[in-house]
Structures are given as structure tokens and as C-alpha cells.
């Protein structure tokens, strides 16, 4: 599962599917499969703007798809949001998938990895806030020391 989350699309694939998508769009109608393939590539990009664009395309597809297609759309919506560190949204999608398919092992593993990332980022966030608080307290102490010495 971690391989799926960390996999990057090749530039060649991204360009190939973008060209196909743009060609169909210019002709007036993009097929669901073409839109999904392009979105799937975008979600695996190393650029956050591409990932966001892929998420938008997947969200557009969601109401149009069959049950099987929706499962894929929701899964990659969770993956895209995970890659953007939008863990709450990623969890929303993966838990929705687990409601309809409680035995889906891929979704269970993705949920576990999202929870793990949230805990890790939460701890890192707390450490940063704690470090900033110590820095402010230290600075206040130095200012207090300087003021008391200047009065002496």
C-alpha cells in the first residue's frame, strides 16, 4: 500500500493521458475512462497542483460511475488527499468505502496508514509548537534579565 501512496507517475504517461484528455475535451466529450486515467496520473504526480486537479476530476466522475467505478474513484480520492496531507478528507473517503465494503483490505490498510500519518504529523506539530513556546519563554527571560541589569 505504501508503494501506491508513494508511486510517482512518469512524465511520459502524464503527457500521454493529458493529450488524450485534451483531445477528447476539444472534440466535445470526454469519456469516463479517459477522465479517470488522466485523474489517476495527476493524483500520482509530484506536484500538489496536479494532485488537486486530479481530485477535482475524480470528484466530477463520482456521481456518474457504476459501483465498481465509484470504488476506484473513492480510493484514489483518498490517495490524493493523503498525498496532500489532507488526512481528514482522506479518512472520510476511505471510511465511506469501508462502509460499503467492510472487508476491503486495501481500504483497511489505507485507513491504517492515514491514521499513522495523522499521529506522526500531530506529534511533529506539537513538537514545533512546544519548541516555539520554549523559544518565546527564553526570549522573554533574556529581555527580563537585560531590563533588570539596566536598572542596576
Swiss-Prot record:
The annotated consequence of residue 91 to P reads:
Less than 15% of cells display fragmented mitochondria. Shows greatly reduced binding to DNM1L
Please state which protein family the record places this protein in.
Belongs to the FIS1 family.
Give the keywords, sorted.
Acetylation, Apoptosis, Membrane, Mitochondrion, Mitochondrion outer membrane, Peroxisome, Phosphoprotein, TPR repeat, Transmembrane, Transmembrane helix, Ubl conjugation
Query: Which Pfam families does the UniProt record give?
Result: Fis1_TPR_C, Fis1_TPR_N
Posttranslational modification, per the record? Ubiquitinated by MARCHF5.
Instruction: Relate the outcome reported for changing residue 110 to P.
Output: Approximately 40% of cells display fragmented mitochondria. No change in binding to DNM1L
Q: What membrane topology is annotated for this entry? A: Single-pass membrane protein
| PANTHER family per record | MITOCHONDRIAL FISSION 1 PROTEIN, TETRATRICOPEPTIDE REPEAT PROTEIN 11 TPR REPEAT PROTEIN 11
Q: Where are the transmembrane segments?
A: 123-143
- Outline which residue ranges sit on the Mitochondrial intermembrane face: 144-152
Q: What is the effect of changing residue 151 to A?
A: Protein localizes to both mitochondrion and endoplasmic reticulum. Protein localizes to endoplasmic reticulum only
According to the UniProt entry, the note on domains is: The C-terminus is required for mitochondrial or peroxisomal localization, while the N-terminus is necessary for mitochondrial or peroxisomal fission, localization and regulation of the interaction with DNM1L.
Segments on the Cytoplasmic face: 1-122
Modified positions (Phosphoserine) are: 10
* Record's subunit section: Interacts with DNM1L/DLP1 through the TPR region; may form part of a larger protein complex at the endoplasmic reticulum-mitochondrial interface during mitochondrial fission. Interacts with MARCHF5. Interacts with MIEF1. Interacts with PEX11A, PEX11B and PEX11G.
**GO aspect biological process, one term:** mitochondrial fission
Q: Gene name?
A: FIS1
Q: What is this protein called?
A: Mitochondrial fission 1 protein
Molecular function via GO: identical protein binding; lipid binding; molecular adaptor activity
